[in-house]
Amino acid sequence: MVQTLQKKGRVVVGMSGGVDSSVTAWLLKQQGYEVVGLFMKNWEDDDDSEYCSTRQDLLDAASVADLIGVEFEYVNFASEYKDRVFADFLREYSAGRTPNPDVLCNAEIKFKAFLDHAMSLGAEHIATGHYARVRAVDTARGQRFQLLKALDASKDQSYFLHRLNQAQLSRTLFPLGELHKTEVRRIAHEIGLHNAAKKDSTGICFIGERPFREFLNRYLPTAPGPILTPEGRRLGQHHGLAFYTLGQRKGLGIGGVKGQQREDGTADAWYSARKDLKNNALYVVQGHDHPWLLSDTLRAQDVNWVDGEAPAAGAYAAKTRYRQADAPCELRADEAGFDLSFAQAQWAVTPGQSAVLYDGDVCLGGGIII
């Protein structure tokens, strides 16, 4: 195993009520740790909404803790989430970008507010159900902690964890990093967890699965505007620029509009390609591989390097969205951010999303695409 768990002390496990964090708590108890399960409530604006699953998730987490015999506690981080994550989320959408709140939520809530709270409970480590790994290495600068991809490539979550620092990683355990999801479900069934078949959570971090347009409208003023082609032809009206992202095909409302057609009468689909905030216009292009959707370079800022120092210039690999295959690239970093040049043009590189850099299985860090 990459991550050797030697010192058996107190570890606080973030328990969400899902199968991953439940199995994490059980595994650590089996390894001899004093486990405390902690449920984090991070959203309370609409607790009575049909989309809010917090109550059931809390009951699921408490039930698992009781079954496996670990202490269980509850903490409310709703204020911290709103100030540190949600406010940034709204600012980014207002600026025409498409943020990834899961990245900031991990850095500010799960591995900062949660870590601080766990330390106040006398914990030596925290643990979560993320699919990633931590490795301690000896260097000329002393012991350093590397963030590695999970063994299960289909579930690897290192992309969302790239903003973690050395202090956070030194206190963090990821027991599921060495397992495949099928093994986790099997363990859950074998030990009799009632949530063994519970589906994985999706949607905005901690806010859940709810109609995005309806949700965003509650917090962000939006105005309709024209949908235009690169030539300036008006095709329709958008509902507000915040509701669209680069490369979006569904939900444009122009499905019946014909553009350039082939000899057989068929035509390529329309894709969202650019936002003009000044004129409140959404530009769309026809065809998945339209030049407006392809980029062979990018610039990122608001950077975090896991090691604390920028990597040397050279050849690496990068992801510009979750579940994307690693793309070979050249890195040039400076004090304000970094530039990437890709061997092959990347599709729909989206401002506000994270560009995350890798050296093999090692996640080096990343920044926000501008």
Curated annotation (Swiss-Prot):
The protein's name: tRNA-specific 2-thiouridylase MnmA
Broadest EC class assigned to this enzyme: transferase
This protein's encoding gene: mnmA
Classification via NCBIfam families: PRK00143.1, trmU
Function: Catalyzes the 2-thiolation of uridine at the wobble position (U34) of tRNA, leading to the formation of s(2)U34.
GO BP annotations, alphabetical order: tRNA wobble position uridine thiolation
Region: Interaction with tRNA, residue numbers: 155-157, 321-322
Subcellular location field: Cytoplasm
CDD domains with a match to the protein in the record: MnmA_TRMU-like
Cysteine-cysteine disulfides: C105-C205
Residues binding ATP, per UniProt: G14, M15, S16, G17, G18, V19, D20, S21, M40, G129
Organism: Bordetella avium (strain 197N)
Pfam families assigned to the protein according to its UniProt record, in alphabetical order: tRNA_Me_trans (PF03054), tRNA_Me_trans_C (PF20258), tRNA_Me_trans_M (PF20259)
Record's keyword terms, sorted: ATP-binding, Cytoplasm, Disulfide bond, Nucleotide-binding, RNA-binding, Transferase, tRNA processing, tRNA-binding
